Amino acid sequence: MAGAGTEEVAQIRRAMSQACGTSSGAGDAAYWGTHDYAPLPMAALANGAAVHAREIDDFGGCAHSGAVVMPAALGMAARVGASGRELLTAIVIGYDIARRVMDGGGGYQAFKSVGWHSTSACGGFGAAAAAAKLMKL
């Protein structure tokens, strides 16, 4: 979340609002570090950029799972009114699934060797799993 206040992330938020025709404050998910809201997919994308903006990433899962899993999980948890326990469970599931997808694909080097960024290639599965858990799917 350290990058939430950077100009680069502010530019991402403005560009997405303009491209999607939404105004600042219109939506159900918070842009971290602001008082603005956006539709959940937009907020999750901008918040993911904020996580990664300062290169202070976590390690584990599919290398930097937090940049993908956390924005989706926190946004969905807010939307459904999840408890802290439900949120934490969903985050753990998200990291686990992202890692399993990476391992199933041959590991980090296998993804890197074909030009795929494992964070985005595997993290999306983890984000989807975390959101699905919170939605009780």
List each model region and its residues:
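N-terminal core-entry segment
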Residues: 1-137
